């Protein structure tokens, strides 16, 4: 538990230090330079009192948050994070544009998205950690309808990352396998967009791990430690007006960049807006996004008319139920409507339109008049912006360029003119996400190939007699550094278990082998039968690609990575696993060790708690284990209690 608390402390404390040294618009109004935009005196009075409204309990009237606004409706590949920033962190919020730019420069050092076609999953039984290639899995951050998100750490750079695990096909395909192809299309689309979109307010993709033999795709993303944007607490808002305004500005910048690149998100909502350590909001989840590089036409309109996303954030043109009137044309204005609903949620802690039934909700979105609560008071500028964002007619709805120029959006900025100039998306080059890039975003796996892979993966290896001169395949759970002096020699889990099970088949053969390896033990009781020893290692840590091993075991959130200690004693090589650092690993000494090459694996188990109290020539033996009496290991609290030995041929 101590390591967990220390780890969380190291993650939180630097954030506070950064925020303390940044500019706060709430207290630095006197430093705001004059701007070309008109001032609204009424808003300065609102701003002075806006930060304290969170302490009050404002009634939401007769409105309730309907289940339709939750995560379960329609949204695919949703980030569902468990960590939420506490209210004590909200007061440290500030104008974070400069800090976001510094972090953005660090993310740009990643370069192009790395594509890996080979995946190696490992589970370390000694430390309880799981590894996907060189990423250490720490814990689960959350899961949605079609995927899950893990917190990982790069074992090389020690950087925290988010690993999104997405199945290539639906687990429960429905009529005509339509869902399977739909899921593939969502995964392809999200990967293709994340590969090309590079913006400070869009979640950055670092690596795509896509093994053709795997049924899942692993997306390595930047870690958003703040989780989802908080917006409601028992139908009451949790953000001040200035905080909601800053979050809103970040979303506007990210959404403007996406529209400039010809990408319509189609699922803008607070659950898909994530916070990083500097409280910068970034847009995530592009599973239902639409790519329209060539402009919008009739085919685009038909595709955009499909109701994907979250119903509570649907635009009126998506909810059209009147057959007597023509439906308005569908365009990127649906994202502007969802942006307005999101701003309403951030300000008032609830959705503008709610109903118990989906059809009733659609009718309200199309026909019901927008009702803006009087508390908290967002001023005339805020009301004007909400009305223009939530305009029923998409032709009359405000555009994102107009949103950026709106006085309510610019209020509180140090230099609005410079902000508009630096955030212009036309200063960056356009990216094109072609149909071929979407189609080739992931590798396809045939059903026959998957079945054959599972068949060979679960088949136990045939028993064979080990030759002392032959090398043994390495166990996936044993990770050791490469050595230039010796070849990589190891022992697989199933082979180790089979080797011990074969010792109980033939008693005479067992006695002969015991005489060669453990003559002292034979002198005590040569007729004593040892029970059949099965370590339970003859199964894989990850049974198959459809079920992760993390569902069956808990996480150990220690900071250290399992290390390997190796010593050479005569003709034996000893490997020991420990969760300590390399400098703390006790050395193994075995002077005068005389081992005979039997070609049989030997497992030595020592009870080091009582090791010092025992005579030097006494070696405790656990029934079912074959131990080596001549192996002297260093005692003490730092000495590992487990080691694996096997014969090998040293290389000169």
Swiss-Prot record:
Superkingdom to which the source organism belongs: Eukaryota
Keyword vocabulary terms for this entry: ATP-binding, Cytoplasm, Kinase, Nucleotide-binding, Phosphoprotein, Serine/threonine-protein kinase, Transferase
Name this protein carries in UniProt: Serine/threonine-protein kinase ssp1
Basic and acidic residues: bias regions: 508-518
Catalytic activity: L-seryl-[protein] + ATP = O-phospho-L-seryl-[protein] + ADP + H(+); L-threonyl-[protein] + ATP = O-phospho-L-threonyl-[protein] + ADP + H(+)
One matching Pfam family: Pkinase
Native source species: Schizosaccharomyces pombe (strain 972 / ATCC 24843)
Active site: 267
Renumbered residue ranges of the record's region Disordered: 467-491, 506-529
Annotated Protein kinase domain residues: 135-409
């Amino acid at each position: 538990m101590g390591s967990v608390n220390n780890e969380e402390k190291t993650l939180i404390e630097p954030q506070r230090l950064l925020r303390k040294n940044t500019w706060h618009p709430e207290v630095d109004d006197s430093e705001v330079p004059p701007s070309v935009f008109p001032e609204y005196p009424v808003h300065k009075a609102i701003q002075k009192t806006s930060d304290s409204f969170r302490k009050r309990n404002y009634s939401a009237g007769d409105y309730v948050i309907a289940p339709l606004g939750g995560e379960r409706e329609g949204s695919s590949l949703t980030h569902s994070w468990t960590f939420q920033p506490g209210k004590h962190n909200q007061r440290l919020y500030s104008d974070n544009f400069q800090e976001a730019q510094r972090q953005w420069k660090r993310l740009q050092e990643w370069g192009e998205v790395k594509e890996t076609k080979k995946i190696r999953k490992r589970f370390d039984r000694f430390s309880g950690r799981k590894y996907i290639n060189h990423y250490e899995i720490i814990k689960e951050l959350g899961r949605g309808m079609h995927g899950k998100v893990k917190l990982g750490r790069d074992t090389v750079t020690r950087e925290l990352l988010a690993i999104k695990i997405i199945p290539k096909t639906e687990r429960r395909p429905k009529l005509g396998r339509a869902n399977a192809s739909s899921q593939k299309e969502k995964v392809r689309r999200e990967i293709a967009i994340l590969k090309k979109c590079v913006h400070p307010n869009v979640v950055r993709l670092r690596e795509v791990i896509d093994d053709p033999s795997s049924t899942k795709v692993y997306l390595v993303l930047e870690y958003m430690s703040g989780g989802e944007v908080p917006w409601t607490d028992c139908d009451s808002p949790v953000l001040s007006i200035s905080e909601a305004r800053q979050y809103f500005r970040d979303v506007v910048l990210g959404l403007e960049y996406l529209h400039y690149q010809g990408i319509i998100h189609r699922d803008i909502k607070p659950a898909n807006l994530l916070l990083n350590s500097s409280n910068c909001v970034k847009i995530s989840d592009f599973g239902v996004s639409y790519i329209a590089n060539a402009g919008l036409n009739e085919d685009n309109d038909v595709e955009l008319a499909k109701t994907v996303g979250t119903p509570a954030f649907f635009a009126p043109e998506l909810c059209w139920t009147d057959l007597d009137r023509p439906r308005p044309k569908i365009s990127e204005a649906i994202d502007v409507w969802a942006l307005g609903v999101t701003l309403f949620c951030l300000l008032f802690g609830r959705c503008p339109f709610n109903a118990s039934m989906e059809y009733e909700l659609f009718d309200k979105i199309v026909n019901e008049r927008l009702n803006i609560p009087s508390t908290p008071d967002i001023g005339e500028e805020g009301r004007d912006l909400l009305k223009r964002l939530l305009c029923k007619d998409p032709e009359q709805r405000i555009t994102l360029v107009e949103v950026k120029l709106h006085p309510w959006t610019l209020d509180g900025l140090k230099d609005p003119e410079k902000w508009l100039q630096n955030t212009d998306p036309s200063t960056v080059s356009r990216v094109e996400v072609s149909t071929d890039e979407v189609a080739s975003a992931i590798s396809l796996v045939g059903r026959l190939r998957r079945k054959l892979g599972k068949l060979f993966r679960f088949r136990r290896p045939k028993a064979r007699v080990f030759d002392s001169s032959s090398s043994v395949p390495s166990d996936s759970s044993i990770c050791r550094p490469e050595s230039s002096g010796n070849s990589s020699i190891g022992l697989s889990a199933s082979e180790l278990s089979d080797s011990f099970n074969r010792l109980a088949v033939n008693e005479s053969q067992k006695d002969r082998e015991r005489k060669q390896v453990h003559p002292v033990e034979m002198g005590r009781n040569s007729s004593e039968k040892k029970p059949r020893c099965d370590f339970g290692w003859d199964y894989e840590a990850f049974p198959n690609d459809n079920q992760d091993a993390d569902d069956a075991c808990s996480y150990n959130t220690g900071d250290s990575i399992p290390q390997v200690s190796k010593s050479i004693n005569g003709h034996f090589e000893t490997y020991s696993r420990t969760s300590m650092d390399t400098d703390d690993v006790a050395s193994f000494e075995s002077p005068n060790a005389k081992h005979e090459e039997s070609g049989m694996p030997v497992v030595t188990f020592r009870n080091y708690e009582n090791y010092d109290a025992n005579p030097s020539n006494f070696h405790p033996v656990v029934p079912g284990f074959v131990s080596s009496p001549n192996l002297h290991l260093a005692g003490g609290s730092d000495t590992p209690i487990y080691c694996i030995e096997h014969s090998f041929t040293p290389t000169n």
